[in-house]
Structure formats: structure tokens, C-alpha cells
Amino acid sequence: MKGASGAVKKKPQVLNEAGEAETAVETVGESRKISGDGGFGSDDGGGGGGGGSGESILREIGDDRPTEDGDEEEEEDEDEDDGGDEEDEEGEGEGGQEERPKLDEGFYEIEAIRRKRVRKGKVQYLIKWRGWPETANTWEPLENLQSIADVIDAFEGSLKPGKPGRKRKRKYAGPHSQMKKKQRLTSTSHDATEKSDSSTSLNNSSLPDIPDPLDLSGSSLLNRDVEAKNAYVSNQVEANSGSVGMARQVRLIDNEKEYDPTLNELRGPVNNSNGAGCSQGGGIGSEGDNVRPNGLLKVYPKELDKNSRFIGAKRRKSGSVKRFKQDGSTSNNHTAPTDQNLTPDLTTLDSFGRIARMGNEYPGVMENCNLSQKTKIEELDITKILKPMSFTASVSDNVQEVLVTFLALRSDGKEALVDNRFLKAHNPHLLIEFYEQHLKYNRTP
């Protein structure tokens, strides 16, 4: 049956008032009337039926269904709103008052085609049966729907681009969308970096400024020294606030200065007294009574507090202590008998020619139990090398090491024994001058 809609439900046949058995067959967008003798009603009256205006309308005696034009308008609205889905006719709601059209055995009325799929290489359509709920929809193969080819063509046309349909393909934005996402991420990272830089500059602006020049008297010297270091680091960070990693470089520079032997020679060792200490020199730029005309610095004897938390490996970074190790045999021979008049705490002379208690981890610093004697300045630096006293040579790791002991004159006028290792670390110019004065050579024949 060409005009009949193929389906899968059974409906009872109904006799109209004239006693004629009519078979109602409807298609989406088309309804035809089949008379008892099997003729179709058409526009031109062909097929054995009477003529009608527009498409033939399925009617029963006493049936008040809307015209075909109204049905077409409803179908157009359904195509626009639901993408090809069709709603039930208005007369469907009045099914309780009037009887359904009669269908042949094995034929069922189709309301709409919902979806399309391909299973095992075969096309299937999801059919909505009129008068049945959505849960009763079934997937029908194309072979079962040959009688409603026009309905299938209309559904396929609704799936084409440019027309509303159930399937809506996702639009591919192309590579430009990825570029936009990358630009957004980049801008976000730049904003975060700018915020971190601004916060760093604000934090650095609150750091303390450089204090006044250091004074070498009293217990506030160590605190001033620490403040000066912190101010130096803060100024370096402010000057390079554009880079977050510059603070680490400033710390490395500070550590390099701690290991610089030349700077340590001018600074001299540090002594702590009740949590505070003093340096022999404030640095290269320190001037005053503590600097002699020959460029050497004076020693400020302080009491060494054993309970001070500053005692430890912090000041052991000095290059002289790491580079030259104390020789036990030399230190035993360097005790001078001329130190009888000193206090019992200061009667030990170390291998470097300076007075210090045995076991003192800061060689060259003089200890005194009485804090009132801190105003007495005793110059203990070596001022002149008098003559060599002994010579020892040793070989370690196939390298010959020579140790020469000299009799030297201290700044207090007393003589002391020192070795060439100490002179290399603390008084290299005196050692070089002595070598130049006593240099001898023989001409080769």
C-alpha cells in the first residue's frame, strides 16, 4: 500500500453509520481515505474515489477533525521547534469521545520518526507510534518502512545542514580557539608574575636602611655588623627587584666575601663578649685609631663567653683557618719564656705568635676576664722578621712541604717564633720582603 503508513500495532476495525467498513491510513503530511471497494480519493478524482480540495482528508461520518491545511501548519511548527519531531493531532485528545480510524490487520499508525542509527551496516529508524507512549518506541529497519518512503525522505531532508533537525553537529572552531586559550593562559601568568614582583618590591621597601659607620667600642658592634649585612642584602634586592632570583645571588656574594682570604686578613678574628663581639677591623673602609701607618690593624682583647651562641663554625669560614693547619710539634716549641709577667689566663703562646688560651678556636684573640681592661690596647701583630731559626721538610702525596720557623718582633716589642705558614696568611709582605733581602743565586757556568 503506497499511501499507508507501515507500523507494528493492531487496531480494531470500526463500522461507520453507513455500514461501510473503511480502512484509515495516515502518513505524516498526507491522509488518504480508502473506501470499502479499495478506491483512493484524490484531487483529480482518480483511483475510483471522489475529488477533494488539496490533499485528501481522512474523515468519518460525524468526525470533526481539522482540515489538512491546519495539519500542515502544525507539522511545520513541529519541524521548527523539535527538529523534525511531530506532535499528535488535536483529534487525538478526543479519542475518548470518538473512535479511532480502523486499520487493517498487522498495520499500525505512525506518528513521527524520532532518530536514525546504523547497526551492523543497516539503517534503522526510531518510530513513535500514535497512541502509544514514548517508552513503546521501536527501532525499525528500512525494509519494514518501504510503504512510507515519502516520510523517510522528509526526515532525511530535515537532517541536512541548514535545516532544523534532531542531530546538531558540534562546530569545529579550528586552531584559532587554541591560540586564544594559550594567549589567555600567558596573560594570566604575566599578571601573576607582576603581582609577585610588586609584592616583593613592597616587602623589600620595608627593610632597614644602612646604619651609620661602625664603631669598634662596646657590645653593640656585633649588632651593628649584622644590621649592616642585612641592609646590604636588602639594597641589593631592591636594586634588582625585577628578578626574583637576585636575592639568592646576593647571598652567594655574601658567602664569597666570607671566604675571601684578603678580606679576612683585614677584618681579623672576632671575639664575643656576653653575646656581643668585636672585629679587629670594620672592613676595608674602616679608619681611625685602630689602623697603624703600615696598614695593619690593632687587636682588641675581649672576654670570650663560653655560653655565647655565636661560638661555633659560623666564623670558621675564614680562609686562614681552613688553609693552614696548626702543627702540634711546632706549637710545643713556640712557648716563649718572656711571658712570665702576664696573667695566668694569658700565659700560652700559640704557633702564630699571639697570646691565646690553648684550645681557643679564634687564634690571635687575647682573652681577659676583667672587662674593665678592654680599654688597654696591646698591639700583638708581627712588625719585623729578625732571622730564621729552624727548617723542616716533609713529603705528603709526593709534594714536598717546607716549614721555616722565624724569630720575629711583635708590635709590643717582644720577640716571638712564627712559621712561614702564618706569615703567608697574615703578613705576606713581610715574608716577601725578607726573602728578597736574603735572596742569593749562583751563576751557572
From Swiss-Prot:
Region Disordered, annotated ranges: 1-108, 156-218, 267-291, 308-346
Tissue expression per record: Mainly expressed in meristematic tissues of vegetative, inflorescence and floral organs, like in developing ovules, petals, root pericycle, petiole and petiole side of developing leaf blade or vascular tissue.
Basic and acidic residues bias: start-end ranges: 57-68
Residues in Chromo domain copies: 108-167, 378-442
Gene Ontology molecular function, alphabetical: chromatin binding; DNA binding; GTP cyclohydrolase II activity; identical protein binding; methylated histone binding; sequence-specific DNA binding
Pfam family, one: Chromo
Listed result of changing W132G: Loss of interaction with 'K-9' of H3 and loss of chromocenter localization and punctuated distribution inside the nucleus
Gly residues composition bias: residue spans: 36-54
Knockout mutant characteristics: Dwarf plants with early flowering and inflorescences termination with floral structures in both long days and short days. Phenotypes of the lhp1-3 mutant are enhanced by the disruption of EOL1, thus leading to reduced plant size, early flowering in all photoperiod conditions and altered leaf morphology, associated with an increased expression of H3K27me3-positive genes.
GO annotation, biological process: cell differentiation; chromatin organization; flower development; heterochromatin formation; multidimensional cell growth; negative regulation of DNA-templated transcription; negative regulation of flower development; negative regulation of gene expression, epigenetic
Biased composition (Basic residues): 163-184, 312-323
Effect annotated for changing E22D: In strain: cv. Landsberg erecta
Domain of life: Eukaryota
Keyword terms, alphabetized: Chromatin regulator, Developmental protein, Differentiation, Flowering, Nucleus, Repeat, Repressor, Transcription, Transcription regulation
Domain notes: The chromo domain specifically binds to dimethylated H3 'Lys-9' while the chromo shadow domain is required for dimerization.
Function, in words: Structural component of heterochromatin involved in gene repression, including several floral homeotic genes and FLT that regulates flowering time. Required for maintenance of vernalization-induced repression of FLC. As part of the PRC1-like complex, recognizes and binds histone H3 tails methylated at 'Lys-9' (H3K9me) and 'Lys-27' (H3K27me), leading to epigenetic repression. PcG PRC1 complex maintains the transcriptionally repressive state of many genes, including Hox genes, throughout development.
Full protein name: Chromo domain-containing protein LHP1
Species this protein is from: Arabidopsis thaliana (Mouse-ear cress)
